[in-house]
Amino acid sequence: MNLLEKTRKINAMLQKAAGRPVNFKEMAETLCEVIEANVFVVSRRGKLLGFAIKQSIENERMKRMLEERQFPEEYTKNLFNITETSPNIDINSEYTAFPVENRDLFKTGLTTIVPINGGGERLGTLILSRLDREFDNDDLILAEYGATVVGMEILREKAEEIEEEARSKAVVQMAISSLSYSELEAIEHIFEELDGTEGLLVASKIADRVGITRSVIVNALRKLESAGVIESRSLGMKGTYIKVLNDKFLSELEKLKSS
C-alpha cells in the first residue's frame, strides 16, 4: 500500500463510525495494519485506551501491563517531556517501548512517540514500536494523522462528560426546588439517617422524631423518584429501601444545608 491507500484505510475506518464514537482499539488496529508496528494509545494518566500488536513481545512485565491496561506511572510522566513527534528512539532510551530488562533480545527495537494534543493541552500519547526497520516519513504522517483523530475523540468524550454532569446537576436542582419547605426538611433528615447512597429507613419513625406527617415524607420521596434522582421501594413493616441514582444529589443537598 502507498501513502494514499493507507490514508484511505484510516478514513474508511472513520467513515464506518459515521457519527458514533471512534473506538480506540479499532484505531490502534488500523494504524497497526498501515504502519506495520505495535501501536499503543495511552491517556495522560497512563491508561491504555487501545492497542494492537504486530510483533509479539514475550515479556511478563509487558504482558501484565497489557492485561491491566496501564502503563507505568514513571514512564507516563516522562512522556510529557516529549512535546513533538520523536521517531526511531533506540532500546537504550528511557522512552523505549521495549522491555529494558531484555535489551539483548531487542537490540534493533525502535520506538516512535507522538504526543496527542487538543484544546491547547496534552491529552495523551501515541506510541509505536517495531523491530525490523526504521519509521519513515510516510509512517510519521500516518501516526500524526492518527494522533489528531484520537485527540479529537478524547475532546469529544470530555465535552460529553461535562454536558452529562451539567445535565445531572440541573435535574437535581429542579427536583430540590420542587420540594416545599417541610418536604425539604424531611429529605434532609432522611439522608442524615441514611448516611450514604442507599439504605433502609422507617418513615414513621423519622416523622415522629422531626415532628412532621408521614405523608410529607412520602410526597418528598415521590417527587425525587419521579425526577429520577432516587429509587424507593416499600418493604412493608421493614420500612422503605432508598437508593440515590443521581450522584450530584447528595452534594447539592449538602450545599443547601450549609448555605
Curated annotation (Swiss-Prot):
InterPro entries: CodY (IPR014154), GAF-like_dom_sf (IPR029016), GTP_trans_reg_CodY_C (IPR013198), Transc_reg_CodY_N (IPR010312), WH-like_DNA-bd_sf (IPR036388), WH_DNA-bd_sf (IPR036390). Residues 203-222 bind DNA. GO terms for cellular component: cytoplasm. One of its GO terms (biological process) is negative regulation of DNA-templated transcription. Transmembrane segments: none annotated. SUPFAM superfamilies: Winged helix' DNA-binding domain. It comes from the Bacteria. It holds the Pfam family CodY. Its main location: cytoplasm. Gene3D superfamilies: 3.30.450.40, Winged helix-like DNA-binding domain superfamily/Winged helix DNA-binding domain. One of its GO terms (molecular function) is DNA binding. It is found in: Cytoplasm. The keyword Phosphoprotein applies. Residues 1-155 are annotated as: GAF domain. Keywords: Cytoplasm, DNA-binding, Phosphoprotein, Repressor, Transcription, Transcription regulation. The modification Phosphoserine is found at residue 215. DNA-binding global transcriptional regulator which is involved in the adaptive response to starvation and acts by directly or indirectly controlling the expression of numerous genes in response to nutrient availability. During rapid exponential growth, CodY is highly active and represses genes whose products allow adaptation to nutrient depletion. Belongs to the CodY family. This is Global transcriptional regulator CodY. It comes from Geobacillus kaustophilus (strain HTA426). The gene is codY.
